Amino acid sequence: TGPDFIIGVRGTVDEMQKGGITANEGIEIAEQLRDSGLIDFFNVNRGRIHTDPAMTEMIPVAGMLSAPHLDIAGEIRRATGLPTFHASRIQDVATARYAIAAGHLDMVGMTRAHMADPHIVRKIQQGREETIRPCTGANYCLDRIYQGGMALCIHNAATGREETMPHVISRAAISRRVVIVGAGPAGLEAARVAASRGHDVTVFEAADAPGGQIRLTARTPRRKEMMGVIEWRMMQCENMSVVFHFNTLVGPNDVLKLSPDLVIIATGGVAQNQLYETQEHQPHLVTAWDILSGDIVPSGNVLIYDEAGDHAGLQAAEVALQAGARVEIMTPDRT
């Protein structure tokens, strides 16, 4: 390979666990590797991924601190004098710039950020940082990997599907009139893509603001970053002159008055509340949506039946606990 071949070492310099490698030991190991003269750079991380809680410390999710491990990466850089790389929830350009300017890193890893928007570098070079699609820390990508699936992105449908779904949207040969009913994530994505294709797009939404169920989930402080999915699409749509009508519940005749060439129904799902075979307990039955929206303030003894095993059930439990209720969760899931 020759003397100019670049060799780097990626490793954990602080396992954050009793009996594991400590920060001081990690620095000592890094210094010994430097003294060997065999390596040119370090790629530093902190923690372990042997459990789900440990993995979220090493690869932080939405609601956690931004770039929480820059300190140890900076210590390695200062102790060894070698170029240092690091990636751990550095999800935006401002944080990346700080990491370099403050002397913590020489190279910033933005893994999930590039899954959300693979054109980050190009947009920086072109002075279009405001158009970067933000990583919201949903960790859908990692959830899929650890379930044996492909690494996809909740915010960018093209990621992982490049063979069939291009990141760059081409213009249509003929411009058409498109009407979309619903301004949740699906409706906004349909509007964005249609407008990017050069179509004339109108969106109707019954609520007073866009977002749909994402607006509900984002009411919990630790999930507020999910609104980035909506805010980015709204900015894109507004820049392409998509017309929005909020507080507007439309029927077929309202839509047909616009003489559309294409109609897209994106009104989302409906909360499932048909839990009981009889109506005896119906007055006491509410949905997670009712709790997350604030329409219902839970009190007393609250039983949450969670068939989905996703965020909504536990978020509802969190809101109920904060309201002072006594909460019990029932689920068919094993864990």
Q: Residue spans of the language-model regions?
A:
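Short, contiguous acidic/charged loop-to-helix segments that flank catalytic cores in large enzymes
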Residues: 57-65, 168-170, 175-176, 216-228, ...
